[in-house]
């Protein structure tokens, strides 16, 4: 019963951190406890159909807070997104240099380990070009874990947590007909986006469907709180389960690279986030999460847990995903062409398993 065990451990961590008042405790706690259990050798796993269902549910909840008030300042988004794209490129360059100079990684592994997000594509390229798959995976997963735990705590420490985004819609379903319409439209939009291979298609498709219905004032309901909480807990478990098949010894061997690269990427992201806050009328918490170098789906769940503006955060993470995906693919293939026969690193072995995003 590994799935039941995973969900129980996730619930223990998520509810526990929530009860002690930790911001975003559901996603942070579930990810932390599942990650620790996976490192301890427990078989942590979430079935793909269940994970996909939760992506759709979270997308519906994110879209439920869309209202004219949440789109205030949308005209200034292009400048903010442009700065984010520049920040992503600077993060990759700085972190690549760090991994090369400090930890001696080969150029290709350093580039792929430095990518802020786009983990599925990065792991595919790592396996295709025989890079240090396990090291790259650990650096990426540790970065997400540190962000999910550190961001809420940091925002709370500096008094930057925000009240829930107020919507004109009720958050408890009072009409089963409207709820059925909401779920049906959002699910169809999610499936269409998935079929089109849109980045984060299930979550963004459901967000688009739900956001349209709520923004157009066509429905006035959302999912009950328990459904949203269960979805957030489960997606936290999905992120934590990425530590499966990683021994503590292997984790420790890459810990320096993980923490160091996280510090470099965070410093670059923070400098650009401060620039945006100084120039544009956005809340600090929204900007911080939008510029955080974490996985797109996890950052959207974190935005929901912290009651942030999902449209602003989602638009920025989508833009970063597209920019990083293109840049990494081009740069990786250039590196391979320049050194087609050069071995990557003494620890790299063909066939080392890759993590899926």
Language model region names:
Residues 102-142, 282-316:
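Alpha-helical membrane segments and immediately flanking helix-loop junctions
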Residues 117-122, 137-156, 268, 296-298, ...:
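Membrane-embedded alpha-helical segments of transport systems
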Residues 16-32, 51-55, 77-88, 109-114, ...:
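Structural signature of hydrophobic alpha-helical transmembrane segments
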Residues 31-76, 209-215, 225-252:
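Hydrophobic transmembrane alpha-helices of secondary-active transporters
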Residues 2-9, 15, 66-97, 179, ...:
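Entry/N-cap segments of selected transmembrane alpha helices
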Residues 68-76, 157-174, 216-223, 249, ...:
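Membrane-interface helix termini and inter-helical loops of multi-pass transporters
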């Amino acid at each position: 019963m590994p799935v039941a065990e995973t969900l129980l451990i996730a619930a223990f961590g998520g509810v526990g951190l929530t009860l002690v008042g930790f911001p975003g405790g559901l996603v942070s706690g579930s990810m932390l406890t599942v990650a620790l259990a996976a490192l301890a050798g427990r078989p942590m796993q979430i079935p793909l159909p269940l994970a996909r269902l939760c992506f759709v549910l979270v997308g519906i909840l994110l879209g439920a807070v869309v209202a004219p008030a949440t789109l205030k300042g949308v005209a200034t988004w292009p400048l903010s997104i442009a700065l984010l794209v520049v920040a992503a490129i600077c993060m990759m360059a700085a972190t690549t240099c760090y991994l090369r100079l400090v930890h001696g990684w080969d150029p290709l592994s350093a580039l792929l380990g430095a990518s802020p997000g786009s983990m599925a594509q990065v792991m595919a390229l790592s396996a295709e070009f025989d890079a240090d798959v396990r090291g790259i995976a650990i650096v990426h997963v540790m970065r997400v874990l540190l962000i999910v735990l550190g961001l809420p705590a940091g925002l709370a420490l500096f008094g930057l947590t925000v009240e829930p985004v107020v919507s004109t819609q009720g958050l408890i379903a009072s009409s089963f007909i409207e709820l059925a319409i909401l779920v049906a439209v959002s699910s169809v939009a999610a499936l269409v986006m998935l079929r089109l291979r849109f980045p984060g298609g299930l979550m963004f498709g459901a967000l688009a469907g739900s956001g349209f219905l709520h923004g157009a004032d066509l429905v006035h309901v959302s999912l009950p709180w328990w459904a949203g909480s269960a979805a957030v807990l489960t997606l936290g478990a999905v992120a934590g389960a990425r530590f499966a098949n990683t021994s503590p010894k292997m984790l420790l061997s890459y810990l320096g690279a993980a923490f160091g690269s996280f510090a470099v990427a965070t410093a670059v992201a923070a400098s650009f986030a401060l620039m945006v806050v100084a120039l544009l009328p956005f809340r600090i918490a929204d900007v911080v999460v939008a510029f955080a170098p974490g996985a797109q789906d996890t950052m959207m769940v974190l935005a929901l847990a912290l009651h942030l503006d999902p449209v602003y955060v989602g638009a920025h993470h989508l833009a970063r995903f597209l920019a990083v995906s293109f840049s990494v693919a081009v740069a990786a293939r250039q590196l391979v062409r320049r050194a087609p026969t050069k071995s990557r690193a003494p620890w790299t072995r063909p066939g080392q398993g890759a993590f899926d995003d």
